[in-house]
């Protein structure tokens, strides 16, 4: 009987020890889990962006990163005017995320067997037809005229050709297109010829209007596009290496959250954002940047909305020239989060 009493007294003590061990085990597991999350969150995300609308939407995140106010840890590459600058770093793994033209994203995807994914759309159409007179009121008014343009062999050319054809103008014989090496060359023609007509991207079109008296936007090609198509012109997207997405999902989600907020800041606080844009050398002067922001169609589309816009636009580019998108239309795994 005494032995039974002694055993009964031991049982509560054993239960207490077991409960303590269980609590310690759960606590250690929780600590380990937190450690993994912290490690993922603290990975340095290497980001590249083109100097233009894509970078204009990223300036608040860039500034927050500099000030140590960003949630993620970022390393921003030097801004570039040449989108091909980021091709090799992306394929080699030297950059994790980059803002690039939508068709270039497709080309990289095809050339790397799915090595990148689109995270979001960041820029819609940025092309404008500009002139110093008032001879152009619609696309049809370009028939028989000479047009100076930039972007040969890239999305500006394919977008222009499609719009012209849908408006009954043969892009090869219905007008004369003189392709310029860059916007500076196109601007020189406008400055020296009062009757010159040009296709310029934003924010350079706005900058040109500050340099050439009487220069005006005759046509926003976004408007001309939506008159003939259901999808948008998708100029720019942000992509990530597929391996990086798999290895650091939390870092990708954090970047997207902060990037979306940065884009909203640019659109909602144009004056303050313009100061940052000028400070990073994207546009020479803040007043010009402030005027250009509403015309740059800086946006943030993700998920199904992103896929619908990008896939529709890529299909039209493919129909114009299959090589413009890398030869084939990307599969569904091209689109992050779907």
Model-derived features with residue positions:
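Conserved C-terminal helix/tail region of periplasmic/extracytoplasmic solute-binding proteins
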Residues: 311-338
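Secondary-structure end/capping motifs
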Residues: 245-320
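Short, glycine-/small- and polar/acidic-enriched structural segments
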Residues: 40-169, 177-179, 196, 202, ...
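Short, low-complexity disordered leader/linker segments with a strong preference
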Residues: 1-44
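Short, solvent-exposed loop/beta-turn-alpha elements that line the ligand-binding surface or hinge
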Residues: 66-73, 223-231, 298-307
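A bilobed periplasmic-binding-protein/Venus flytrap-type ligand-binding module shared by bacterial periplasmic
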Residues: 60-61, 127-136, 232-251, 302
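Pocket-lining segment of extracytoplasmic ligand-binding domains
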Residues: 103-104, 184-277
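Second-shell loop/turn segments in exported
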Residues: 45-46, 95, 145-150, 189-195, ...
